[in-house]
């Protein structure tokens, strides 16, 4: 409903709640949506600051926990996850999302619990991507994909695993699941769903890495039809495009695609894609020979601190700038440890020598096109 109507309903509920714990918890949860933007919705100008939003969400969690109802607590933890996201606290958001899945692990699937179970897995996967825990993102995404209650909505079921697999370089798995995604979406009437546009863009990236420009264009069209507007895709769109462009040695176009300063991307980029965007921006600056590459590396390092994957991307870029082959190979090991087959293979290819041969073979085994050099391109 419109904000004014929602506020009126919330105020009426507050008057009726009295001392009932469940009613008080429900009203506190409503505060998170009516006055704040804790649920990552469409409010352009929420009435609360980031700190106030977090305080509202923490109060909602406290009141929900008192009820002993795991579904009420799950909904409040969702609000707290969103509050952490807007605060730029990606690791706290991921920890809260994981806690939510743990809370729901013993809850039976029912009409009452279905939404919370699905949304908890979605948020756990999304926030895991944000902090570079791709194995975690794959685990939550696989659970989502295999949920019986999503058997007939494959576009939702596969959406998070598609993103995790694409980033890790699991091209074969991503392409297989993309068929289920597309079939289910078409069967649904090609409904607009902006949150699913990221998955379509991720599939487009995989096709781009495979050198299939036609398939990439088709999936980018699907992403646009799903709702990947300029604002919505400000983080993932340039990031995915840059991955493809750099793979094919087009560093200058990649740098141009990443021209926006990270702190100017807007809210839709801030909660999952900020680390990835900043890291790719730094690498593109190095490979394109940008005069401020050291400055962009330093800025990116501050943003990605603690993220094992995007931190390794920044390390790789710094190694390339300093022509430090030993450090470059160390980043390859970091990618391997994180389960990131494509970044690992790409790094070996960039290292040259015998490792380049190993990297090229690994890229071929993943079904991806050969890399171009692209330094200064």
Go through each PLM region and give its residues.
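Residues within HEAT/ARM-like alpha-solenoid scaffolds
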Residues: 23, 112-119, 194
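Flexible inter-repeat linkers and adjacent short helices
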Residues: 1-79, 86-107, 117, 200, ...
């Amino acid at each position: 409903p419109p904000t004014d109507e929602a506020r009126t309903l919330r105020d009426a509920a507050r008057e009726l709640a009295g001392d009932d714990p469940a009613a008080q918890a429900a009203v506190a949860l409503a505060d998170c949506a009516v006055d704040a933007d804790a649920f990552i919705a469409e409010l352009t100008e929420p009435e609360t600051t980031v700190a106030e939003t977090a305080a509202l969400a923490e109060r909602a969690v406290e009141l929900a926990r008192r009820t002993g109802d795991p579904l009420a607590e799950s909904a409040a933890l969702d609000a707290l996850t969103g509050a952490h996201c807007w605060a730029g606290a990606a690791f706290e958001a991921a920890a809260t999302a994981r806690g939510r899945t743990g809370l729901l692990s013993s809850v039976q699937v029912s009409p009452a619990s279905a939404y919370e179970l699905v949304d908890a897995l979605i948020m756990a996967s999304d926030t895991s991507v944000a902090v570079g825990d791709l194995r975690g993102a794959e685990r939550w995404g696989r659970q989502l994909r295999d949920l019986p209650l999503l058997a007939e909505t494959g576009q939702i079921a596969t959406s998070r695993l598609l993103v995790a697999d694409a980033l890790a370089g699991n091209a074969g798995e991503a392409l297989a699941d993309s068929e289920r995604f597309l079939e289910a979406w078409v069967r649904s009437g090609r409904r607009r769903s902006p949150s699913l546009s990221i998955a379509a863009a991720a599939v487009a990236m995989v096709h781009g890495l495979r050198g299939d420009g036609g398939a990439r264009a088709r999936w980018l069209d699907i992403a646009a039809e799903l709702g990947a507007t300029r604002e919505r895709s400000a983080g993932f769109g340039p990031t995915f495009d840059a991955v493809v462009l750099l793979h094919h040695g087009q560093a200058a176009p990649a740098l141009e695609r990443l021209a926006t300063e990270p702190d100017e991307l807007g809210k839709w980029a801030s909660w999952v894609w900020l680390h990835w965007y900043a890291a790719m921006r730094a690498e593109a600056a190095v490979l394109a020979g940008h005069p401020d590459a050291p400055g962009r590396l330093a800025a990116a390092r501050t943003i990605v601190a603690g993220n094992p994957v995007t931190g390794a991307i920044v390390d790789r870029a710094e190694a390339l700038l300093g022509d430090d082959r030993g450090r470059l190979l160390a980043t390859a090991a970091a990618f391997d440890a994180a389960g990131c087959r494509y970044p690992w293979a790409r790094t070996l290819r960039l290292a040259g020598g015998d490792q380049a041969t190993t990297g090229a073979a690994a890229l071929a085994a993943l079904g991806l096109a050969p890399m171009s050099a692209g330094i200064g391109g």
